[in-house]
């Protein structure tokens, strides 16, 4: 094989590895990808504090024994699954820890700029310790609803349009 063919294969391999691994390449288990999805769908339209607060709730749950011990486990936790018409297992509407996961809509981010920001936040959040701006919150909800479970918890902070509890 001549040098040009080898060089082309190396460049092609690098490019394929770079582009195909962009979403998952930075962590083997896809934990940052899962966290980025949650930040995107729960707080993508909020300033940095709102995005970090959502990430903190997930981390607080990961560190608590009553929840799964991974970011993906916490985010995709659901009480009930059903079989769709295509034969796939899908979460039952209203039975998920985070509403976007079982709302029946696509889980593919549509706004690429917001997605990139959420992905960068998730990557650095998982790698580095952060001051918990939620004061240990394990739950939150939007300020325009009042779920039944909120009355039994202690409110910690109000950040952007979310109210946080522990």
Label every model-predicted segment.
Residues 5-19:
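Hydrophobic membrane-insertion alpha-helices, especially the h-region
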Residues 1-2:
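N-terminal secretory signal peptides that target proteins for export/translocation
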Residues 19-166:
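Bacterial extracytoplasmic/cell-wall-associated proteins, especially those involved in peptidoglycan
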């Amino acid at each position: 094989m001549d040098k040009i063919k080898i060089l082309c294969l190396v460049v092609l391999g690098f490019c394929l590895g770079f582009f195909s691994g962009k979403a998952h390449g930075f962590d083997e288990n896809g934990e940052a990808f899962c966290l980025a999805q949650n930040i995107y769908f729960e707080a993508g339209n909020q300033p940095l504090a709102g995005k970090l607060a959502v990430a903190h709730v997930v981390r607080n749950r990961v560190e608590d024994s009553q929840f799964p011990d991974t970011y993906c486990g916490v985010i995709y936790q659901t009480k009930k699954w059903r079989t769709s018409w295509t034969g796939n297992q899908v979460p039952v509407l209203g039975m998920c820890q985070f509403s976007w996961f079982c709302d029946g809509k696509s889980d593919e981010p549509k706004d690429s700029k917001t997605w990139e920001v959420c992905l960068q936040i998730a990557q650095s959040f998982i790698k580095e310790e952060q001051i918990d701006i939620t004061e240990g919150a394990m739950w939150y909800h939007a300020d325009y609803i009042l779920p039944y479970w909120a009355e039994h918890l202690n409110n910690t902070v109000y950040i952007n349009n979310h109210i946080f509890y522990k």
